[in-house]
């Protein structure tokens, strides 16, 4: 019993010794209570204000094209034909699951009637490119507009058959929805 009491006492003493702070020089010999010296103020140069001169010479940017190209999201030649031949579409007929084909790959799209901003909630699964950002949609006339999560249009589609919509993304990629 005495040996176990002595061993326990020795263990307590060793444990308490490990909790004490000791200084052996080197890192511990510095006075840690002393604050660092304050920084000295430096002179600040004066600030001047004035009007900038107008740009000289030709503009560094090329002139915008006036014909031959459509603005992003605007109807291109084939889309104009699709718009005039498009079938009528209602929001209710769009609700549900759609199979999307775009840029040679397929994915799923889900459309609901839950309001989200200026459109209705929607989303994609397994899509690539611009369609990954799809967050809402709306029907505008005979056109179905897919929008990103900020409400910006990313694709426009037209009803071409009973359960089929065709169109393109703003980047020009063809998109088809079918059931």
Curated annotation (Swiss-Prot):
This is Outer membrane lipoprotein omp19 homolog. InterPro entries: Inh/Omp19 (IPR021140), OM_lipoprot_Omp19_bac (IPR010571), Protease_inh_b-brl_dom (IPR016085). Belongs to the rhizobiaceae omp19 lipoprotein family. The keyword Membrane applies. A lipid is attached at residue 19 (N-palmitoyl cysteine). One of its GO terms (cellular component) is cell outer membrane. It is a lipid-anchor. Pfam families: Inh. One of its GO terms (molecular function) is endopeptidase inhibitor activity. Keywords: Cell outer membrane, Lipoprotein, Membrane, Palmitate, Signal. Residues 1-18 form the signal peptide. Residues 62-72 have a biased composition (Low complexity). A lipid is attached at residue 19 (S-diacylglycerol cysteine). Residues 32-72 are annotated as: Disordered. Transmembrane segments: none annotated. It comes from Rhizobium meliloti (strain 1021). Its main location: membrane. It is found in: Cell outer membrane.
